[in-house]
């Protein structure tokens, strides 16, 4: 199982600390976690190709005001080329009204709300170990078919 933590930064010199923090908190799953940082100035095709080539089963995006439009645009194409991949988001641009975000973004599997470390670790248990269910993970809003469930 491969889990990709993806960040789309405003500039090349910027770094997204959130994805590094999530990876460090879930260090027991280090061999399953991939990390990629991109910029919103890279071509969409370049990023799509790189994400595709990771072979990730789950892709988690860190979403902020400067990248949310870019992430949504990427997601539309990613879902077409990786229809079996699960897509998750976290960050201030998606967590304040996660249900509305999921209704507007049908390609997204779920949103991690609030502080993401414990939630991400629980998602790792779920996806990598096959333990529990999404209904048991606090701090997520997720899609189950046409229904949206809020465990926030």
Residue ranges of each PLM-predicted region?
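A short, flexible N-terminal coil/short beta segment enriched in small residues
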Residues: 1-20
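Glycine-rich beta-alpha loop elements in corrinoid/cobalamin-binding modules
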Residues: 2, 18, 25, 29-152
